[in-house]
Amino acid sequence: MTEVVAALIWDQGKFMICQRPAHKARGLLWEFVGGKVEPSETKEQALIRECQEELAITLDVGEIFMDVIHKYPDLTVHLTLFNASIQTGIPQKLEHNDIQWIAVNEIDQYAFCPADE
């Protein structure tokens, strides 16, 4: 099972979602920013690293929002989703097709990766 972390980044009543690049698995679907936990990292350290690599931001990682195990055809992931806020930086599309800030009632307008639903 692959350990994965993601950030539910809140700002002014909205949260950030990111669109995966077309060339990657589950391309053009939306997700919460994050990635795989390396063996030497805590989940929080992995989330901070992934957000620096993918968005050029530093996070303030909060409490766990949700834990889920999802089986894709090609892998099984244990996803830990953390509440978070941006400490420094402005999100950049370094590894994503698009970034959106949405309200909770807008979530159904976006096609998400199944583990992020």
Question: Each predicted region: which residue ranges?
Answer:
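Active-site-adjacent beta-strand/loop module that shapes the phosphate/pyrophosphate-binding cleft
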Residues: 67-90, 100
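Conserved hydrophobic "DFG−1" position in protein kinase catalytic cores
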Residues: 9-10, 17, 86, 101
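Hydrophobic packing within well-folded, soluble alpha/beta domains
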Residues: 47-52, 64, 82, 99, ...
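Conserved N-terminal beta-strand and adjoining loop/helix that marks the start
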Residues: 1-16, 36
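Short secondary-structure junctions
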Residues: 54-61
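Conserved Nudix-box catalytic region and its N-terminal flanking loop in Nudix hydrolases
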Residues: 14-53
